From Swiss-Prot:
Binding site for heparin: L156, R157, K158, R159, G219, K220, Q221, L222, R223, G224, R225, L226
Sites of Phosphoserine modification: S141
Record's subunit section: Homotetramer. May interact with ABCA1; functionally associated with ABCA1 in the biogenesis of HDLs. May interact with APP/A4 amyloid-beta peptide; the interaction is extremely stable in vitro but its physiological significance is unclear. May interact with MAPT. May interact with MAP2. In the cerebrospinal fluid, interacts with secreted SORL1. Interacts with PMEL; this allows the loading of PMEL luminal fragment on ILVs to induce fibril nucleation.
One GO CC term on file: intermediate-density lipoprotein particle
Name the record gives this protein: Apolipoprotein E
Chain residue ranges for the region called Lipid-binding and lipoprotein association: 204-273
Origin: domain of life: Eukaryota
GO MF annotations, alphabetized: amyloid-beta binding; antioxidant activity; cholesterol transfer activity; enzyme binding; heparan sulfate proteoglycan binding; heparin binding; lipoprotein particle binding; low-density lipoprotein particle receptor binding
Keyword set, alphabetical order: Chylomicron, Endosome, Extracellular matrix, Glycoprotein, HDL, Heparin-binding, Lipid transport, Lipid-binding, Oxidation, Phosphoprotein, Repeat, Secreted, Signal, Transport, VLDL
A single BP term in Gene Ontology: receptor-mediated endocytosis
Transmembrane segments: none
Entry's localization field: Secreted; Secreted, Extracellular space; Secreted, Extracellular space, Extracellular matrix; Extracellular vesicle
Signal peptide annotation: 1-18
Length: 299
C-alpha cells in the first residue's frame, strides 16, 4: 500500500513539473508584420496573446476583470473581417475560373478560415475560464492555475500558428487563381484592342484617299445599284404583262361561255313564243272567216 501511494505521489509531482516546465517559444512569421491587412490583424492578436502568456502582475490584474476577453474579441473580429474582405477581393478576380474549381477553392478556404476563428475563440474562452477559476479558487492554488493556463496557451498558440499558415497557403492558391483569371482577362482585352486598332488603321487608310477616287468609287457603286434596280423593275413589268394577258384570256373565255349559255337559254324560249304566236294568228283568222256572212245572189 505504501509503495502504491509512493508511485501516485511521484506521478503527480511529475505531472505538475511537466505543467510548469517551459516549452520552446513559438516564433510567428515575419510576414504578419508587413503582409496583407488580415495578416497584420492576426499579428496584433498574436502579440496580445504572447503578452498574456507572460502572466505579469498587470496581466493577472486584467485577467481578473473582463478587459482581456473584450480586447481579444475586438482583435478576433478585426482579423476575421480582414480575412473576409481579402477573400471577397480575390473572388472578384476569379470570374474567368471554372465554377467547379472556384467552388472547391472557396470551400477549402472557408474551412481553413473557420479553423483559425475557432482557435482564437478557444483562446478567449480559456482565459475566461481562468478568470472564473481564479475567482472561485475551488481547491486549487493560484500557482497551479497559472501553470495550467500557461501550458494551455502554449498549445493553443502552436495550433493557431499551424492553422494560420494553412489559411495563408490556401489564400495564396486563391490569389494564384485570381492572377491567372486576371491574365486571361488582360489577354482578351489585348486582343480586342488589337482588333480595334486594325479597324482604325483601315478607316484611316480610306480617309486618306483622294476625294476624286472616293467619288469615283461611290459613283461606280451607285451605278451598279441603279442597274440592279432597273433590271428588277423590268423583270417585274414583264411579269405584270404576262399576268394581265392571262387575265384577259380568262375574261374572254368566261364571256364566250356566258354568251353560249345565254343563247342556249333564250333560243328555245323565242322559238316557243314564235310557234304560239303563229297558232294564235291562225286561230284568229279562222274565227274571222267563220263570222263573215256569204253575200246573196239577186234574180
Amino acid at each position: 500500500m505504501k509503495v502504491l501511494c509512493t508511485v501516485l505521489v511521484v506521478t503527480l509531482l511529475a505531472g505538475c513539473r511537466a505543467d510548469v516546465e517551459p516549452e520552446p517559444e513559438v516564433l510567428e512569421p515575419a510576414v504578419w508584420k508587413s503582409g496583407q491587412p488580415w495578416e497584420l490583424a492576426l499579428g496584433r492578436f498574436w502579440d496580445y496573446v504572447r503578452w498574456v502568456q507572460t502572466l505579469s502582475d498587470q496581466v493577472q490584474e486584467e485577467l481578473l476583470s473582463s478587459q482581456v476577453t473584450q480586447e481579444l474579441t475586438v482583435l478576433m473580429e478585426d482579423t476575421m473581417k480582414a480575412v473576409k474582405a481579402y477573400k471577397s477581393e480575390l473572388e472578384q478576380e476569379l470570374v474567368p475560373m471554372a465554377e467547379d474549381t472556384k467552388a472547391r477553392l472557396s470551400k477549402e478556404l472557408q474551412a481553413a478560415q473557420a479553423r483559425l476563428g475557432a482557435d482564437m475563440e478557444e483562446v478567449r474562452n480559456r482565459l475566461a475560464q481562468y478568470r472564473n477559476e481564479m475567482q472561485a479558487m475551488l481547491g486549487q492554488s493560484a500557482d497551479e492555475l497559472r501553470a495550467r493556463l500557461a501550458s494551455h496557451l502554449r498549445k493553443l498558440r502552436k495550433r493557431m500558428l499551424r492553422d494560420a499558415e494553412d489559411l495563408q497557403k490556401r489564400l495564396a492558391v486563391y490569389k494564384d487563381g485570381a492572377s491567372e483569371g486576371a491574365e486571361r482577362g488582360v489577354s482578351a482585352i489585348r486582343e480586342r484592342l488589337g482588333s480595334l486598332v486594325e479597324q482604325s488603321r483601315v478607316r484611316a487608310a480610306l480617309t486618306g484617299q483622294p476625294l476624286q477616287e472616293r467619288a469615283q468609287a461611290w459613283g461606280k457603286q451607285l451605278r451598279g445599284r441603279l442597274e440592279e434596280v432597273r433590271g428588277q423593275a423590268q423583270d417585274r413589268l414583264e411579269e405584270m404583262r404576262e399576268q394581265m394577258e392571262e387575265v384577259r384570256v380568262k375574261i374572254e373565255e368566261q364571256a364566250e361561255a356566258f354568251q353560249t349559255r345565254l343563247k342556249g337559254w333564250f333560243e328555245p324560249m323565242v322559238e316557243d313564243m314564235r310557234r304560239q304566236w303563229a297558232d294564235l294568228i291562225e286561230k284568229v283568222q279562222a274565227a274571222v272567216g267563220a263570222s263573215t256572212p256569204v253575200p246573196s245572189q239577186k234574180p
